[in-house]
Amino acid sequence: MADVPKREVENVEFVFEVMGSPGEGIDAVDLGDALRALNLNPTLALIEKLGGTKKRNEKKIKLDEFLPIYSQVKKEKEQGCYEDFIECLKLYDKEENGTMLLAELQHALLALGESLDDEQVETLFADCMDPEDDEGFIPYSQFVQRLMSDPVVFD
């Protein structure tokens, strides 16, 4: 706890109040969501490595167990930031005007990296996407801003 500033500990405690049960901690299946609520972007592999589970009620993570995890993820270099995502999406911006085809974004989310499933992509688009224009293009910077500012919850 020594390497986590007091203000950040307060933020972590708040996330635990919202996501967990008093004294019991948070469900390990919610580890990634808790970290993302604290403005971190861990990969699914890292979440699993740090004790995240895929099924609810397998394990609980208490606050004193979570703080070292939070500290470790905060130091991770493999997190994407806004600029990283924009640079990646610029590869699809053939006109260099801040837009890309919605179909290309959908394909990238379904097939590349830590891919999402169809339902997750639909939820993501419903929560973060501007409507496409008549030619099928969307402004990708607003999409990334919304994506990074408001966590999208997948059931």
Swiss-Prot record:
EF-hand domain location? 7-41, 80-115
Q: Which spans of this chain does the record mark as coiled coil?
A: none
Matching Pfam families: EF-hand_7
- Which InterPro entries does this one have? CALM/Myosin/TropC-like, EF-hand-dom_pair, EF_hand_dom
Q: Which PROSITE patterns match?
A: EF_HAND_2
GO annotation terms (biological process)? mesoderm development; muscle contraction; regulation of catalytic activity
Q: Does the keyword Transmembrane helix apply?
A: no
Q: In which tissues is it expressed?
A: Indirect flight muscle isoform is found only in the indirect flight muscles. The larval and adult isoform is present in the larval and adult musculature.
Q: GO: which molecular function terms?
A: calcium ion binding; enzyme regulator activity; myosin heavy chain binding
Instruction: Cite the entry's keywords alphabetically.
Output: Motor protein, Muscle protein, Myosin, Repeat
One GO cellular component term: cytosol
The protein's assembly and partners: Myosin is a hexamer of 2 heavy chains and 4 light chains.
Q: What is this protein called?
A: Myosin light chain alkali
Please report the organism this UniProt entry assigns to the protein. Drosophila melanogaster (Fruit fly)
Taxonomy of origin reads:
Eukaryota, Metazoa, Ecdysozoa, Arthropoda, Hexapoda
Which gene codes for it?
Mlc1
